[in-house]
Structure formats: structure tokens, C-alpha cells
């Protein structure tokens, strides 16, 4: 593999976590491992993941639609702040103005999803909050699974450590565009997320 110029992407065992303890009461786990949806904007998942290179770190916040696995919105920042999470949700909410949908928004128990700003955004837009059970990673497995595949596919044959922060940001953005529009999935009948939504949504 070395002769062919192929570099193995080694996933780091330590995973970024925004959990800072039970800062406020958690809402019920409505999703409860059911990551299916019968229509677009019925059920959303959200999470933040860390991407590190030699020049520093970037944090990717996403909202993923359970109907077709599409990344509805995303934001990239140099810090995992509440603003990063809120801006991601605000961007997704803008797309609801063309519909009557009021999705469930499911997250882990991280601090970003328990601050007043996040709660106000969900309440003001009549979204239904759902949170994973304490210490139960599988409760948001669909979102975490996306990040795992992304870190493998996005940096296949490339070393993330060698990228600058600007290059890393471009890689992340380009991957999401490719994933939404071109990455076919067996679970979607050989269609990409956008193709599936346009045909069946």
C-alpha cells in the first residue's frame, strides 16, 4: 500500500464530547433508537464532531434527516460553541418555511443542547426535542455513524494531519456536498440522499 501511495486513516480512540454533566433536566428520548422516518423533516438528528490537523482543530456541527440521511444543514467552527450548534439549527429551520413540518430534533445530552438559546430556538419554532439516555452512545448512533464514515471516506488516500485549517474546511464542505448529491446508498435503493428525496419525498 505504501508503494501505491495509499495512506491508512487511523481513527483516534478519544472522542470529542460536549457532555458536562446534568446541567439541566433532560427531555425524554422520543426517538428511542428508531432512526426511520416516513417523510422529510419528520425526524432530525444532530451532533458535533472534532477534526484535528497539524495546524489545529475544526468542529463540524450537522443536522441529519432520518428520511433520507441527508445533511439538512451544517456549520464549521474553530470552537465547539453553543453558537455553532444554534447556527446549524437556525439554518435548518429556514428550510422549514416552505413546509408545515415541525420535526423532532434528537441530540445527545451535550451542553450545547441544554443552553437557553437552543431551547428557545426549538420552542419558538415548535420543534420537538428528544435526547439520548445518559451514557448511551447508541441512542445517537446514526449521527455518529455518519461522522465515522466521513472520516474514512473524506480522507481516504490523504493525511488529515498534513492539511491546513483552510484546506480541512474545504475538504469537509466538499464531502458533505458530494455525500448529499452523489453518494449512492444501498439503503436508499442505489440513490443519493437528494435523489431519494426528490423521487420519494
What positions do the PLM features span?
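Hydrophobic (often cysteine-bearing) scaffold residues that line and stabilize catalytic clefts
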Residues: 27, 41, 60, 81, ...
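RNase H-like two-metal-ion nuclease catalytic core shared by retroviral integrases
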Residues: 17-20, 107-109, 115-116, 132-151, ...
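C-terminal domain-tail junction helix/linker
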Residues: 123-125, 151-201
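Basic, flexible linker segments flanking DNA-binding modules
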Residues: 1-39, 136, 192-200
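Active-site beta-loop-alpha junctions of metal-dependent nucleic acid enzymes
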Residues: 52, 75-98
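Short small-residue beta-strand/loop micro-motif enriched in glycine and branched aliphatics
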Residues: 70-74, 129-132, 155-158
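An active-site-proximal beta-strand-loop segment
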Residues: 33-72
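Mobile genetic element proteins and their domesticated derivatives, centered on retroelements
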Residues: 1, 31, 47, 63, ...
Amino acid at each position: 500500500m505504501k508503494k501505491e501511495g495509499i495512506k491508512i486513516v487511523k481513527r483516534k480512540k478519544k472522542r470529542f464530547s460536549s457532555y458536562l454533566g446534568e446541567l439541566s433536566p433532560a427531555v425524554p428520548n422520543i426517538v428511542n433508537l428508531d432512526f426511520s422516518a416516513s417523510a422529510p423533516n419528520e425526524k432530525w438528528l444532530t451532533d458535533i464532531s472534532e477534526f484535528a490537523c497539524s495546524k489545529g482543530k475544526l468542529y463540524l456541527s450537522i443536522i441529519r434527516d432520518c428520511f433520507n440521511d441527508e445533511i439538512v444543514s451544517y456549520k464549521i467552527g474553530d470552537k465547539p460553541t453553543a453558537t455553532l450548534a444554534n447556527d446549524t439549527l437556525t439554518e435548518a429551520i429556514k428550510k422549514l418555511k416552505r413546509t408545515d413540518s415541525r420535526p423532532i430534533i434528537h441530540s445527545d445530552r451535550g451542553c450545547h443542547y441544554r443552553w437557553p438559546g437552543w431551547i428557545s430556538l426549538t420552542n419558538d419554532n415548535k420543534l420537538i426535542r428528544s435526547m439520548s439516555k445518559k451514557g448511551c452512545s447508541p441512542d445517537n448512533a446514526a449521527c455518529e455513524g455518519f461522522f465515522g464514515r466521513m472520516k474514512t471516506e473524506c480522507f481516504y488516500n490523504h493525511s488529515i494531519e498534513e492539511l491546513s485549517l483552510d484546506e480541512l474546511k474545504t475538504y469537509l464542505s466538499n464531502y458533505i456536498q458530494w455525500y448529499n448529491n452523489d453518494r449512492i446508498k444501498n439503503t436508499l435503493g442505489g440513490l443519493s440522499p437528494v435523489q431519494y428525496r426528490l423521487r420519494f419525498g
